[in-house]
Structures are given as structure tokens and as C-alpha cells.
Amino acid sequence: MAAAGLVAVVAAAEYSGPVASGGNLSGATCGPSPGLGPGPGPGSWSRSVDRALEEAAVTGVLSLSGRKLREFPRGAANHDLTDTTRADLSRNRLSEIPMEACHFVSLESLNLYQNCIRYIPEAVLNLQALTFLNISRNQLSTLPVHLCNLPLKVLIASNNKLVSLPEEIGHLRHLTELDVSCNEIQTVPSQIGNLEALRDFNVRRNHLLRLPEELAEVPLIRLDFSCNKITVIPVCYRNLRHLQVITLDNNPLQSPPAQICIKGKIHIFKYLNIQACKIAPDLPDYERRPLGFGSCHEELYSGRPYGALDSGFNSVDSGDKRWSGNEPTDEFSDLPLRVAEITKEQRLRRESQYQENRSSVAVTNGGVEHDLDQIDYIDSCTTEEEENDVKQPKSLDTNSLSSQFMAYIEQRRISHEVSPVKPIAVREFQKTEDMKRYSHQNRVPVEPSLVLSMPPSHNQLSHSDLELHQRREQSIECTRREAQLAALQYEEEKIRTKQIQRDAVLDFVKQKASHNPQRQQPPGNGECSFPSRRSQHTDDSALLVSLSGLDGVSCVATRPHSSAFTPLKSENRVDVTSSFPMTETVHHSPAYSFPAATQRNQPQRPESFLFRAAVRAEANKGRASPLLLSSAPATDPTDAITRQREEELKLIDQLRKHIEYRLKVSLPCDLGAALTDGVVLCHLANHVRPRSVPSIHVPSPAVPKLTMAKCRRNVENFLDACRKIGVPQEQLCLPLHILEEKGLGQVAVTVQALLELAPPKQPPPQQPQQQQPQLSAV
């Protein structure tokens, strides 16, 4: 008993805290021990150091937390603590790791949280069973090298004064958690990539400028590098496929930008994957795909529902306020343009390869050129009208052509500086030259004995090549003869057609002078008929009825009157586009309407686009005065085009004045671009008849440009409103006239017809104007 009392007195002398009342010398407080589970209960505050040592000898758990000890208790020498596995010396005033604790060879967990430790002795190497070490909230400036030779699994060194990590940190092969947050670390050594078992890495609140790329080789689950000076996340971090939590707030990040980082981990890794594809464009497809994540369902803000983390893909809501001002909002609205560019590049690449290998590649499709497979044939053959349509500028007539054909023409015009459908002479010349090259390269003189000694398969191949060449030569010769025949017949028909035109103009003038200008059917005259199909002997020149210069000859050109001359025979046909190019036209007079008989017989007309082109061209010519045509039947096409262009400009100017006057707005110089989204036109329709367009898609400050789908919806709503108000169908423009800015003249006709149906505006009251002079006189 005396010895026990002496130990208690010595412990009390070592303890510098207050002494409990009643003579109890073990009144030191004992707080909870972080890292070692729940601390002792309230009754432990009165336990003596001696009882703590006795319990450590029995249980193997030493708890001396919160006793303000400056050194290890000396009474520990009286107890066998060699089997201690867990030691809690936190919340004391120790300046170094006690030497007594370094001899606990069975120690697995050591907690030195919140002390004054500045040095770790080398004797710590004796703790070869230590797996958990908490030295946070101390005054360490460096981690000693010998600390990296321990079998640690958890190392917590936060809230110290560390300026760097030792390169030997890579020796901690079994380390799963490393916490060095709240220090002054400026760089992380590349050897951290050797920590093949690391799962949790926390470098929060340091002075890091960059992240080591070697960290991408570590199977991290949690990464926290917030509150640093990091500007770029390495692209290789996309390989962190096991990462579930990444915390990166309070960093001046530039790549990925902040708009992507706030959306969460999924978007960050998508961005890194896209950047990797840009850096290495030759990556195979399977490496371009984003890597999967193992059980990866958490985001940056775990309490936030995942549905709110919208990527913005396919988002066309113009009122969305999630986008920042400097983030592109119409990044995906031009997807068709990107697809078109990709298709163009692929096509050009294929054609260049074909041109290089053209002389050495055997064609097996019966003598047809390989590049002709890329041509979308219309009416089963390629015509001169098609070639001319490709070469004409954008101001060509689009009213008579289908949208599919116009898209086809535009695609060919963009993808080729020179049209792949070459003129006949050039195309045949190239075929002949290719055949000559092929013949010189492949026809090598051989001896008959060698031919007999060749295997049968080789002989069959040679015979097939010869037959193929013969078929190609025959087809070329046949095509050449047909082209020459077509050219001769074209000249003859051109002469005959001019004579027919003069006679028809004279007949029309006589008929107009003798008949009432009202619409009537002259007796004995049928409607104007057109050939239902082209001549069978032509392949490269389509021969149609040339109605150029005939005002009143065509059923479409003379809408108030019927045609007055007999149908033309099939041989009296000529290429319309060769003499008069088609131009984009508008209907000038809203009072014109098609005859009922023409509408009844409309399904019997041929469906060829060439027929529609001829009809449209003659509709343009029909607006000229018959007297002028009778006096000068052979008018210069250039003058007609110039005249039509001037009329179109007048219509466009009139359209601008109408809109500005009705809506009290000032339109920009580019009127077509101002009307493309359909907003102005929808407001104009509502001005004529309120609520005729119930909903209008308008731009917003966040999304200043409407998507093509919303622009088309506005335009279609405007045209529907025009139909409901009463605009005739023949005066309605097409949506592509507005969306593609290719038919402002037709839009002007539609707007003019719409405004004619508007109620007359009441004149402003005159009373204030009459009183104004009286007031000024007073």
C-alpha cells in the first residue's frame, strides 16, 4: 500500500493541472481520443494515470488523452506495456514522440493528435506493427524519412507546417489513406504514383500549383485538393476510373472551366476525355470512349438531386439561366453543319484516293465509272439542265424544284469546286485517256508459250479484263455518237423553235386584240400540252419545249387567259436552261390564279424537275408586256434578268417599308437575316389579326439566338396564320424562302397579300392638330 501511495504522489507531482478537492490527486481530465473509437465515459475524468496504466497492461489499450502531459509518465516502468496495441496520447503537451512508446513493439495504432511535437525520433522504426499514425495538429516542418519505412496504412499529418513530402513517400506500399491537409506543401513528389494501395488522398488547404500526373496511376476513390492554387486538372486524370468523390472547390481552375466543374464529376471527366481526343486525334475508337466508373453515383454536392445536374446536351430552352454569359449556348444547334462538314471531308478523301488509284483499279459494274455511283440520278440519266443548275449561283429559282433536289444541288456545289458531273466532251475525253493509260500499263506483250503455261484462273482473269475493256470502249463510242446526234438535232430544233415562237407571239397579239381580256376559253383551241417524256435517243442533253419569250403561250405564263395554239410535237423541244437561265422569281400580281382546267389536268403533267423548271422560267418571262414581246421577240436574257432583279429589289424595299410602318420598328440592313427567325413576321400577323399566332418563340439574354427548330416553328406558325386570315395559297411563300433567305421577293408578295386583308387603319384624330395653332396663338 505504501508503494501504491508513493506512485500516486509521484504522478501528482508530474501532473501540472489542478488538484481535485478532497485530496484526490487524480483529478486530471480525460477527453475523448480521436481515431480510436468512442472515448471513456463521464466517470473517466477522475481516473488516475495509475489506473490508466493498469488498464493498459490488462487490455492493451493505453489512453492518456487530455492530461496535459509534457513527457511520458514515469510510473509506466512499473507496468508491463509491451503488449499494448493502441496508444492514445492526444491533447497533451508532448514535444516529441516518447521513447517509451517507441518500445511498444506490438503497437498498431498511435494517436498523437494536438500536441507540440516538432521531431520524430528514429527509434520509431521499432514499431514494425504500426498501421495507424495520427500526428495532426502538431508543429512538424518535415516528415522524417524513417517514417516511410513503417507498414503504415493510415497516415494523418494535417494541420502542421509541412512544406513538402519526402520522395521516400513511395515506400509506403500499404498506405490506403494519406491526409496532409492544412499545411504549406507546394509540390507533391512524383513517387506518390507508387502508392498502389492508396484510396483516399487529402491535400486540402495547401499551396499546390499543379497536380502530379503520376497520381492518375493510383486507384483513388476520394480526392480532395480544394483550397489550393491549381489551374489545370491533367487530362490523364480521366483514367481515375474508381474515383467516386472529387473535391476541387476554391481553386482558380481554367481547365476544366468553372461552368463544368460545378456540374459534378461526370461532366469533369467528359471534358477531360474530349481534351484527350483533341490532343491525340489518332486514337482508336475504343480509346476515345469515356472510361466507366465503378459504383460511381455521387456528385460534387451529394445532397443535390442528380436530375438537376443536366449536361445541357440537346437543351433548347431559350430561357435557361444555368448557362453563364461566357459559355457558348448554341454549341449543338449547328450539328447538321458539322455533320455536313464531316461528310464533305470523307467524300473528298474518297475521291482523291479514287483519282490516285483510278488507273490501277478494275471496275466490275459493266463499264460505268466508279465516280458516277455518287451521283443521285433524276429521271434515270444525267442532263445538261442538271449541270447548269449546279453551276448557277444561289439566286436561282427554287420555287419549281423540290427541297430534296435543292439540297442535293447545294451539297454538290459545296463539296466540289468543279461539279463532278462534267460536260460530255470533257468526261468522254477523260475516259478515253484513262483507257489508254490502263491499256499501256496492263497490256504487256507475252509469248504464246507463256500464255499456254499460265494457270486457268489467270487466263480467265485476262479474258474478263479484255471483255470489260471492250464493253467500256463500245459504251464510250456509243455515247459519243449519241452526243453528236443530240447536238445536231439541238441546233435544228433551235432554229425551228424560234420560228414557232415568232408565229405564236403574233397569234397571241391578234387574239388579245380581238377578245375580251376577261378569262375565257377560245373555241377550237385546247390547253397547252407539254411532252410527257424526253427523247429516247438523248443521254446528255434533255430536249424540252422552249417557251422562252412567249407571254401568253404557256398555261402558267398567261394565267388570266388560256393558251391559244396547238400542242407541240415531241421533236420541237429544246433545252430551256441552255438559252435562258432560270432565276428566282416572285408573283407580282396577287390577282393571278391558275385556270381550273389547268388544275384539273395538273396530275397528268410529267413529274420531272426539268418540266417544273421550264414552267417556272416561262412564268418569269410572262410578266413582260406582250407589246414589248411582239415588237422584240428575241430579247436579250441579260436584260430580262436585270429587269427582274430590279423588280425584286423594289419588292424587298417595299417589304421593309411595310414592316417598319406597321410594327414601328427599324430593321437592319440585312433584311433576310432579320426575318429568318420568324419573330418579326409572327408579330406582323398578330398586328393584322390579334392572336392569330398564339405563341411566338423569342430569344432571351441567356440564349440570344434561336435554334433552327424554333425558327422553323415560328415560320410555320406565320404561314398558318396567313392561311387562316385568307391569303391565297398561290401567294404564300415556302418556309425555306424565309429560313434560307433565298426568296425575299416571294416573302414580299405574301406580306403584301396579308396586309391587303388587314382592316384599314383609322386616321388619327384631327382635333389636337386644329387646337395647336390656337394654343400657340394664345
UniProtKB/Swiss-Prot annotation:
Residue spans of biased composition, Low complexity class: 768-778
GO annotation, cellular component aspect: cytoplasm
Calponin-homology (CH) domain mapped to chain residues: 645-758
Residues found modified as Phosphoserine: 324, 415, 419, 608, 625
Region feature (Mediates interaction with DOCK7): 56-290
LRR repeat residue numbers: 56-79, 81-104, 105-127, 128-150, 152-172, 173-195, 197-218, 220-239, 240-264, 266-290
Region feature Disordered, mapped onto this chain: 511-536, 758-778
Annotated stretches, region: Mediates direct interaction with MYO6: 382-642
Xref: InterPro entries: CH_dom, CH_dom_sf, Leu-rich_rpt, Leu-rich_rpt_typical-subtyp, LRR_dom_sf, LRR_domain-containing
Pfam family, one: CH
Principal location class: cytoplasm
Compositionally biased spans, kind Polar residues: 514-523
Alphabetical UniProt keywords: Cytoplasm, Leucine-rich repeat, Phosphoprotein, Repeat
Cellular localization per UniProt: Cytoplasm
Single GO biological process annotation from the record: septin cytoskeleton organization
Role of this protein: As part of the DISP complex, may regulate the association of septins with actin and thereby regulate the actin cytoskeleton.
Record's subunit section: Component of the DOCK7-induced septin displacement/DISP complex, at least composed of DOCK7, LRCH3 and MYO6.
Stated name of the protein: DISP complex protein LRCH3
Organism: Mus musculus (Mouse)
